[in-house]
Every structure is written in structure tokens, then in C-alpha cells.
Regions:
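Structured catalytic/nucleic-acid-binding cores of DNA maintenance enzymes
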Residues: 1-317
Length: 317
């Protein structure tokens, strides 16, 4: 599944190719997607100008502008497990009749770069999704967008998460730390790949209970998660299966993964063996040496979230 680094790469690739373009035509395959598309949205989208492209966690947000369309209208895109959002050059006489089922293209938009067809270049925005676990959602105004995000609450991204809040969240749950990293309501953007990589970088076993981590371990994990994600962004994400960037180019970070997908191989840090186990139905990769399971002394009795916050405030006074 594309995670934050992959989605950020798509956003960076597509921003100069989409912003300022006008959507001339829009065609939908009619296939059922997890995030369903409605046929009545086709008329709303046609004629719109794309004014911005932003990312929030694993979501892409395209702002749209058109006469008669309320302020705040736009599109939300989630790539799911196998989704791809790419732009290709085309001509004005493109035809959706040439679609082939094996291409798995579910939405395509003809884009115009100039004011008039005579002095414009044409391109197509394509949404592919073999497993159809993603999708594109249209919202007509800011209120609809706010309602959408209320139904899909997101925690802060690793670099935006205050340490005191992070420590408090871990102190308040006995769930396994790998499971907590995947909870988008607690911390957003991390998926299976970068959860494994973050835990390895921090030297923490994935089955540890979150509330067994002491303050230093929690701080180290948050810092390593930020570093892991930023390095992956610099390498254009990890192309392990279907992922490609917005210009249909593969990422490079799969060549630098320390544990994910390396079962049975030697740890790049200590030489220990990489093993795989199942946690909550997901594969987890870890080093048997530098992530050896051990009971942490944990927090002292009464060292709960409230006390941590009060201590932090006293330190800052």
C-alpha cells in the first residue's frame, strides 16, 4: 500500500502537471471502488480548473474552481493498496473506447493547459487500481470536505506530533507498538513498511506493549519514524509491487530497506537474522538481535499522561 512517502512523491510529481489545468472531459469505468465514484459528479468536474494539490497523510486533495461551483470544491484521492495516479501526454482526439480491462483504469480526465484549444497542450490524468481498494471522492464545498474528514479522523504526522502527546498516547494503551504505529487516528501516514523500518531504527521489538516503552524509547521511536519517512521521500518511495510516482516512474527506497521484505537475510546493522511474524493480520519484520524482545522497566507508578504533561509544563516554566 502506498504510504506517506509514496503519496508525497505523487503529489510532488503531479503538482506542476496539474495546477492551472482545466478538466475538459471526464470518464469513469463504472467499476465499484472502495471509495465510490458517482456518475453525477462527472458534470460537476468537467470545466473545473485545478487550483492546488496538497497531501494529508495518505490522502491527496485537488482544489477545483468553476463558475457556479461553491468555494471549497475539490477531489479527495486515496490510492488504497494498488492505486496509481499519473499524468500522460495525449491529444484532443483521445477516446475512452480504447480502454482495456487489464489496464485497470477507472477514471481518466482530459486536461487543457491553456486558455483556448488552439494554443494548448493536452494531457490525461489517469487513476488505475487493480484491486480497487482506493478511489476518488468529489465534494461540492468546504462543509462537505469537513464532514468527510470527520468520518476519517487523522492524527498528526510524525514530524508534527508533539513528544508529550506521543508519550501520553503510548502510556494510555497496552496494544502492541506495531499496531499503534498503524493507527491513523494516533499518528498518520505510517503503513506496514515504514512501521517495520521505524521500529528497527529505534531498536524496539514490534510486539512490545506500547505502555511498556519508557520516555526515552518513545522519543527515539518518534524521531526515527520521522527520519525513516523523510529518507523514503528523498528516494521517491518504495516500489515493491504496484507503486509508481505521478510520472509513472518507480521509487528507489526499496533498495535501502533494513528489514521489510528481508526475511532470512542478515541485519544491515548488526548481522543478526531478520525474521517475520504476524501481528494483527499483518506481516512484521524485525532483527532477532538488535530488536530482541525484553521487558522494559517502563514508567514508574503514577507516571500517566496527566503527570507527564504537568512535568513537561514545569520544565518549560
Amino acid at each position: 500500500m502506498p504510504e506517506l512517502p509514496e503519496v508525497e512523491t505523487v503529489a510532488r510529481d503531479l503538482r506542476p502537471l496539474l495546477v492551472g489545468r482545466r478538466i475538459m472531459t471526464c470518464h469513469f469505468s463504472g467499476k465499484k471502488l472502495r471509495l465510490p465514484w458517482r456518475d453525477e459528479w462527472l458534470a460537476e468536474v468537467c470545466g473545473c480548473q485545478i487550483t492546488s494539490l496538497t497531501r494529508r497523510a495518505k490522502w491527496l486533495h485537488l482544489s477545483l474552481k468553476k463558475t457556479g461551483l461553491p468555494h471549497g470544491a475539490g477531489l479527495i484521492v486515496h490510492l488504497g493498496m494498488t492505486g496509481q495516479l499519473t499524468v500522460v501526454q495525449t491529444s484532443a482526439d483521445h477516446s475512452p473506447k480504447n480502454w482495456r480491462p487489464q489496464d485497470h483504469i477507472h477514471l481518466r480526465m482530459l486536461l487543457l493547459s491553456g486558455v483556448s484549444p488552439e494554443d494548448s497542450l493536452y494531457s490525461e490524468l489517469l487513476y488505475r487500481d487493480a484491486r480497487r481498494f482506493g478511489g476518488i471522492h468529489f465534494f461540492a464545498n468546504q462543509n462537505e470536505l469537513d464532514i468527510f474528514y470527520e468520518a476519517h479522523p487523522l492524527g498528526p504526522e510524525p514530524w508534527d506530533c508533539p513528544l508529550v502527546d506521543w508519550v501520553g498516547k503510548l502510556a494510555g494503551t497496552s496494544r502492541r507498538i506495531k499496531t499503534v504505529l498503524l493507527d491513523q487516528k494516533i499518528i498518520s501516514g505510517i503503513g506496514n513498511i515504514y512501521a517495520d523500518e521505524s521500529l528497527h531504527a529505534a531498536g524496539i521489538h514490534p510486539t512490545r506493549c506500547a505502555n511498556s516503552l519508557d520516555h526515552d524509547e518513545a522519543a527515539r521511536l518518534l524521531a526515527e519514524a520521522s527520519g525513516v519517512m523523510l529518507r523514503a521521500i528523498n528516494n521517491r518511495g518504495s516500489s515493491i509491487r504496484d507503486y509508481v510516482g505521478g510520472e509513472n516512474l518507480r521509487g528507489n527506497h526499496q533498495d535501502y530497506l533494513a528489514v521489510y521484505g528481508r526475511e532470512g537475510l542478515a541485519c544491515v546493522r548488526c548481522g543478526g537474522q531478520i525474521q517475520r511474524l504476524r501481528i494483527g493480520g499483518r506481516s512484521s519484520h524485525f532483527c532477532t538481535v538488535c530488536q530482541r524482545f525484553r521487558k522494559s522497566p517502563g514508567r514508574k507508578k503514577g507516571d500517566n499522561y496527566k503527570n507527564i504533561v504537568n512535568t513537561r509544563k514545569k520544565d518549560q516554566a
